[in-house]
Amino acid sequence: MNFGVVPVENSSEGVVNATLNSLADEDIKICGETYLAIHHQLGSAKKFKLADAQTIASHPQALGQCSKWLDANLPNAKREATSSTAEAAKLSKSQPKTLCIVSSLAISKYKLHHYHKNIEDSSFNNTRFLIIGNIEIDQTKQDKTSFLIQTDNQPGSLIKILEPFNKRKINLERIETRPSRESLNAHNFFIDSTCLLYTSDAADEEDS
């Protein structure tokens, strides 16, 4: 039994495209979801004056979630995207005059100098995480159903997808569209609904 946790949507920066692409490409199951408040810390491996900072490193989502604070307080420092906030902490150790945006856990783990706490632009900054796995879990009354539907890029395609849900009064909480990476003339629609997968209504939609 293997499970993983991946970010899918942030309240400030929106959808995490890499996660949607992976959901489309891989044969995995969504087993649950959770929302977490996200707080960002400004640190560096070696202490120096903030005015001397040349680079600010972090994951693109973290850079985006702190962009207004960075514009106001460190407008001259170059922003460098890393694959994770942990990689940003490591870069700060190897690259002089480099700040990193990381979690409070990373500040402690990597023994970083802590300049400022909670530098995210929104005090309500939160991220929705999906719990993914390779097994089906038992259903509950609070379950949702997530659909991935691919359709040709033609007038009325989205209406045809949504009409059966409307007919059966199935509430859709979220719709995201992404270009298909398999065809230039197709799009993928990621849909979250409040109905259970194995109810008759949901089964009808899956088959239609």
Could you say what each language-model-derived stretch is?
Residues 1-200:
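Domain-level signature for soluble enzymes in the chorismate/prephenate branch of the shikimate pathway
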Residues 198-208:
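Single conserved hydrophobic/aromatic residue that forms the stacking wall/gate
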